[in-house]
From Swiss-Prot:
This is tRNA dimethylallyltransferase. It comes from the Bacteria. The keyword Magnesium applies. NCBIfam families: miaA. Pfam families: IPPT. Catalyzes the transfer of a dimethylallyl group onto the adenine at position 37 in tRNAs that read codons beginning with uridine, leading to the formation of N6-(dimethylallyl)adenosine (i(6)A). Keywords: ATP-binding, Magnesium, Nucleotide-binding, Transferase, tRNA processing. It catalyses: adenosine(37) in tRNA + dimethylallyl diphosphate = N(6)-dimethylallyladenosine(37) in tRNA + diphosphate. Monomer. It comes from Myxococcus xanthus (strain DK1622). SUPFAM superfamilies: P-loop containing nucleoside triphosphate hydrolases. Substrate binds at residues 18-23.
Amino acid sequence: MGEGGAQRPLLTVIAGPTASGKTALAIALAQRAGGEIVSADSQQVYRHFDIGTAKPSSEELAAVPHHLVSAVDPMEAFSAVEYQRRADAVIAEIAARGRPVFVVGGTGLYLRVLLHGVLEAPGALPELRAELEALAAGEGREAVHRRLAEVDPETAAKLPPQDLVRVIRALEIHAQTGVPASAFRKAHAFAPDRYPFQLYVLSPPRDVLYGLINTRTRMLFERGLVEETRELLARGYADSAPMRSVGYVQARAVVEGRMTREEAIHDTAQETRRYAKRQLTWFRKEPGAVFLAPPYEAALPLGGCCSP
């Protein structure tokens, strides 16, 4: 499923949409194989943002060594290129210990840069484009530009509101990759297939996945997402990248009195379902991906996973 240099370790990659069960499967497999986990999640990489990013619990982190979780200050710029650099270093250390490497996450851009290095620009999203064009027609191009500024202030600072085509394009890239267009474009091309790898994409039935997302969203709010957000805002993280992610945007609206708690839960679940759909669309384009339906461990090819 991927060919790399002879000295590069085999990576077992567990990918898939949010709430699909990646963490639980990866921990079970890593425990069985005596391996370590490298996260490929563009939000869990930040410190302090714990509840809203659904980080592994303290028990899960203790069960198997995890890397690139809570590794970056929230105010630090962290691109796909930087992720690749840090992941390469961690993978080399794990391999030097003679332990299997499991890469786990739903940020498709991180995985593509790590495995292949080659970034293909994502295609258009007709529904999103139509929505944004309607917003521009109804409320002005500045309204679309403000939406870009919320998720990608760096690109927004470089584009005037009048450049609607490029503003919409930047929002399309963010919608499909989960990272700002500025970070996407900073990533450089490298030789494809940088590691030998086995890529498994968790793909539960849509109704099951959406049910899991709805349940987890409510659980995150019950665990204190609004309170965590209030504390993070007080600590000065209002302008940080993770504060612009789904869940924190809505929780902040509750803190600031712009949404009720139930409205925030509903909106977070809705936006998360949309993101999960885009994640699956992304992974369907990945060469060599093996899609698994639950129960995942039973669906794994015999002898095809997790060799030291």
